[in-house]
Design a protein with these regions (language model features):
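The feature marks long extracellular or luminal low-complexity segments
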Residues: 1-137
């Protein structure tokens, strides 16, 4: 082969390699190592619902609490562990994983009258911004 042709091919391959490396690796490394955004729960989009909001403090009447875990695009997330905390009463379930619809259901009872403030934590990392207030009388 001609030395000029070999030299041009070598320059081309080196230029192409440098361009490819600059294009691929110019982005932060965290972009390649982070979890997909679709799997990250959103503290804003996730929701808490309870029914009834007022219950008897007899230890028998249950308040059903539903937690819906969503990502930032409001898509339900499955298999996310939810831990509820309540300032009053007893949660019959705790540390439940969400179903295909992103839903986990808990039940709260109390023997003491007062106000229960309920918060939810997703995967021990993301606290849902919305909180519930349930009255036991």
């Amino acid at each position: 082969m001609d030395k000029k042709l070999v030299g041009l091919m070598l320059i081309f391959l080196l230029s192409f390699g440098l361009f490819t490396m600059a294009t691929v690796f110019n982005k932060p490394l965290t972009r390649f190592t982070r979890a997909k955004e679709e799997l990250i729960p959103s503290s804003q989009s996730s929701m808490l619902f309870a029914w009834p909001l007022t219950a008897k403090a007899d230890g028998n009447q249950q308040v059903e609490i539903n937690v819906f875990v969503r990502n930032s695009k409001n898509i339900p997330l499955e298999n996310k562990k939810i831990v509820l905390t309540s300032s009053l009463g007893t949660l019959k379930e705790n540390n439940i994983a969400t179903d295909k619809g992103g839903k986990a259901t808990f039940h709260l009872v109390s023997n003491t009258a007062g106000i229960a403030n309920v918060t939810a934590l997703i995967d021990n990392q993301v606290e849902i911004k919305q909180q519930l207030t349930i009255k036991f009388e």
